[in-house]
């Protein structure tokens, strides 16, 4: 199986039945996600971001990845990521789909539409939706919904114009 296979099997077993929602920090859901991420870290997936087979690893974790996706960031172990065809996710994008706020642990899905581009070091928080043909500038933080064909930037990200695709 190898390290990646063990990480996938472990994460899928640990996170079976996990749903988007708000949970207690340090509670069973939080600890299950934490342990699944430690397994993924130990597998070396983070070091292989950008490798062609990373898309297959993402799919094995339960994420929905379209054809022709250019994935340069580690996928979430939760399996709650959906990326449309021909989209691009640059390096070091936070796709984890969870965050801690005080004593609460928030988990949610992330949706990236077809032909969208996510700039390097961007954070997509749980529940973030990036529409088709949309662009998000590097270093942005997307909290809500980026509509189709829009260009967003900043932290928190705000609309800055129309997306420019070649």
Which residues are covered by each model-predicted region?
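Structural signal for interior beta-strand "rungs" in well-ordered beta-sheet cores
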Residues: 58-60, 64-159
């Amino acid at each position: 199986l190898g390290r990646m296979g063990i990480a996938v099997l472990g994460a899928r077993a640990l996170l079976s039945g996990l749903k988007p929602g708000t949970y207690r920090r340090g509670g069973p859901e939080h600890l299950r996600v934490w342990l699944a991420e430690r397994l993924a870290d130990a597998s070396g997936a983070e070091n292989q971001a950008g490798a062609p087979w990373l898309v297959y690893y993402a799919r094995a974790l339960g994420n929905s990845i379209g054809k022709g996706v250019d994935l340069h960031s580690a996928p979430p172990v939760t399996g709650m990521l959906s990326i449309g065809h021909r989209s691009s996710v640059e390096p070091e994008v936070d796709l984890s789909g969870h965050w801690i706020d005080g004593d609460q642990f928030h988990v949610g899905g992330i949706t990236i539409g077809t032909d969208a581009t996510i700039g390097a070091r961007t954070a997509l928080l749980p529940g973030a939706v990036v529409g088709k043909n949309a662009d998000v500038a590097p270093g942005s933080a997307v909290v809500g919904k980026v509509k189709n064909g829009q260009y967003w930037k900043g932290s928190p990200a705000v609309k800055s114009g129309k997306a420019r695709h070649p």
